[in-house]
Swiss-Prot record:
<dbReference type="GO" id="GO:0006412">
    <property type="term" value="P:translation"/>
</dbReference>
<dbReference type="InterPro" id="IPR036235">
    <property type="entry name" value="Ribosomal_bL12_oligo_N_sf"/>
</dbReference>
<dbReference type="InterPro" id="IPR000206">
    <property type="entry name" value="Ribosomal_bL12"/>
</dbReference>
<comment type="similarity">
    <text>Belongs to the bacterial ribosomal protein bL12 family.</text>
</comment>
<dbReference type="InterPro" id="IPR008932">
    <property type="entry name" value="Ribosomal_bL12_oligo"/>
</dbReference>
<dbReference type="GO" id="GO:0003735">
    <property type="term" value="F:structural constituent of ribosome"/>
</dbReference>
<keyword id="KW-0689">Ribosomal protein</keyword>
<dbReference type="InterPro" id="IPR014719">
    <property type="entry name" value="Ribosomal_bL12_C/ClpS-like"/>
</dbReference>
<dbReference type="Pfam" id="PF00542">
    <property type="entry name" value="Ribosomal_L12"/>
</dbReference>
<dbReference type="InterPro" id="IPR013823">
    <property type="entry name" value="Ribosomal_bL12_C"/>
</dbReference>
<dbReference type="GO" id="GO:0022625">
    <property type="term" value="C:cytosolic large ribosomal subunit"/>
</dbReference>
<comment type="function">
    <text>Forms part of the ribosomal stalk which helps the ribosome interact with GTP-bound translation factors. Is thus essential for accurate translation.</text>
</comment>
<dbReference type="Pfam" id="PF16320">
    <property type="entry name" value="Ribosomal_L12_N"/>
</dbReference>
<comment type="subunit">
    <text>Homodimer. Part of the ribosomal stalk of the 50S ribosomal subunit. Forms a multimeric L10(L12)X complex, where L10 forms an elongated spine to which 2 to 4 L12 dimers bind in a sequential fashion. Binds GTP-bound translation factors.</text>
</comment>
<protein>
    <recommendedName>
        <fullName>Large ribosomal subunit protein bL12</fullName>
    </recommendedName>
</protein>
<dbReference type="GO" id="GO:0003729">
    <property type="term" value="F:mRNA binding"/>
</dbReference>
<keyword id="KW-0687">Ribonucleoprotein</keyword>
Length: 125
């Protein structure tokens, strides 16, 4: 272990230019490249790299309309959010408004179903 500690100390004392030269020497000695694999893939064959669409993992549930039965919707909003009666009423009356933000897809679908069962209209975004 003392040898490893000495190597770490020696490497830590290198300048940037010395570290770059060491990197080149190790690449030649071991026959490897420090280049990023993405750069190698983009250079090969002239193929256009496809943009990978990131799958959305967090969703917002938006109350778009309270509907005719606002009392049931207010009760459901209170149950979902844990808000007090006044805060839930204000949220329902201010529609369109986010009821819950940054939730999983399954939870967002469940909340939307509960709101719609109470008579409201909701969207998941």
């Amino acid at each position: 272990m003392a040898d490893l500690a000495k190597i770490v100390d020696d490497l830590s004392s290198l300048t940037v230019l010395e570290a770059a030269e060491l990197s080149k020497l190790l690449e030649e000695k071991w026959g490897v490249s420090a280049a990023a694999p993405v750069a190698v893939a983009a250079a090969g064959g002239g193929a256009v790299a496809a943009v990978v669409e990131e799958e959305k993992t967090e969703f917002d549930v938006i109350l778009t309309d309270a509907g005719a039965n606002k009392i049931n919707v207010i009760k459901e909003v209170r149950a979902i959010t844990g808000l007090g009666l006044k805060e839930a009423k204000d949220l329902v009356e201010a529609a369109p408004k986010a009821v819950k933000e940054a939730v999983s897809k399954a939870e967002a679908a469940d909340i939307k179903k509960k709101l719609e069962d109470a008579g409201a209209k909701a969207d998941v975004k």
